[in-house]
Amino acid sequence: MTLTQLNAFVLVARLGSVTAAASALGVSEPAVSQALSALRVHLGDQLVSRGPNGMTLTPGGSRLLATASQIVVLGAEAHAAVRAAQGAPDQLRVVASPTVAEFVTAPLLEAFTKRYATGLEASSGVAVTKEMAVLVANRLADVAIGPDVAADQGLPVVSEPIFKYRLVVVAGGQSHTRGPAHQWRWLVGPSATDPGSDVGHFVARLRVPEERMSVFPSQTAAWAAAADGGGVSVAVEHLVAQQLRRGELSLVDVPGSPGQGCWYATMLERQQRSAVASSLRRFLSTPEAMQLIRSPSAGVPPSKFRLPVYVTIWS
């Protein structure tokens, strides 16, 4: 029985699938399956099985989950302690929802790194809503920026609001929409495919069927397609302010628009939180951070966005 095997089991149990666990760890699905299989053989128990409603824990798996979670946390703390003893730089690992990752994370981390007193290794990546609390609780991320996820899975994390925003529907400046909203062509970014995100909730309330949605690899690409007259898109209002002023996009009135949203910082509870995570949380309350969130193009132009990949060490 190894730390790798226990880590794989905890993530499969928490996230509900081998696919989600592999994505969170940045490894292949066969690697997770092999680790889980080895643990099953060692313990003589199936631990978790696939049912009609997702993964189901066996009685043995249910008892193992709490203990395995503690061991995974202790392993992460041991790794951090050795790094500190070796004089290695502090690590900061941030995951974020797709829209935050596309526009906000890079300029925030760039500004925070410049302010940080000592050397800092900062990395960032994308996570869907159901992964965020699990990644933080299992020490695979220090901070997650996106929806409020603290109450979802009973994990020792807190979600604190950092920025309120408005969701609007936009189309090309000369576009004309006809008929009910659920019959329009919707051009959306990755957030719309996440049922736990504010954008996912917004689209679901309008009952937009899957066949009426075209999903683009970035929000910028979806807005560009809408500006070209291909359909309508959902946007965080302050992020498209320039396109609205230039007339490239225009607001479309739909029921429930504008919608209200909020980005939260999800972290471990205060007594368990790392010093660098606490420092980032304080920075997120500063006027400098608020300005970067309101006008992120001052940091990294959206046209240069490349979807980041979150990678963890599999050992």
Where do the PLM segments sit?
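Alpha-helical linker/hinge and terminal dimerization helices associated
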Residues: H42-L43, L64-Q86
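Hydrophobic hinge/microswitch elements
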Residues: A127-M132, L140, P147, V203-V252, ...
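Central regulatory/effector-binding core of bacterial HTH transcription factors
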Residues: P89-D152, S315
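Secondary-structure junction motif
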Residues: H182-P209, R273-A277, M290-A298
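Short helix-boundary/capping micro-motifs
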Residues: L11-S28
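Flexible hinge/capping segments at coil-to-helix
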Residues: P156-D194, H201
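A short LG(V/I)-centered, amphipathic sequence patch enriched
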Residues: R40-L57
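Residues within the DNA-recognition helix of helix-turn-helix
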Residues: S28-A31, A35-A38, L108
